[in-house]
Amino acid sequence: MTCDLCTDTARHVVTVKTSSISELQDAPAPGSQFGYHLHFVASDGSHHAEIIHWDKEQRKAVVDLSMRDVPKAEMLTVLDGRLINTGVPHYVQHVEDLEHFDVVGEGRRLRHHPDLGPEGANVNFVEEKPDGTLSVRTYERGVEDETWACGTGVTACAIVMNNHDIHTRGGDFHVRFRQVCDTYTDVHLIGPASFNFAGEILKKDNQIIRRSDIQTI
């Protein structure tokens, strides 16, 4: 999904490009002059997102995104960690000295491990900090490398570690959830979103035939 934000003196406009849109509406954000509510359907079901803060100059937002419920029975003990599906499968493993940990090497080794299912899983390494928060680094399948942050990965680590405040290289996140009987429900991921770049890539027969200049912000 891509989301382009445009404001003028008359109104706020949100353009959303995704495979399935069920609802889009403007709504005032509490305590601010800017707010959007968005409902969309992804591969793991329906989601609700709200932009709760928007910095027009920096083109940065804070987003509150609802996530899928997670039955406790789906959180499995595997290898030296836990396997959980927060929209896509994530393996979560506790480590020491995360800053110097070989995330790419270990992530690549574990990503296709047969115990993580036929399609493998994203791999998250998490360290508990002295202040009680968590630091997380994620090796993402598909990307096949470490990424700055992964929303479903942050959510997975929060639930597995029963913690709500997560630090990543891409920013700080808060995950809100509660356990009702045997299900983690009312799961919300709250954190930063920013405009990073814009560009166009055209492919023909799986070959890139034209790539426009990419503007990095």
Task: Give the positions of each predicted feature.
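Active-site proximal loop and beta-alpha junction motif in alpha/beta enzyme cores
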Residues: 1-149, 156-217
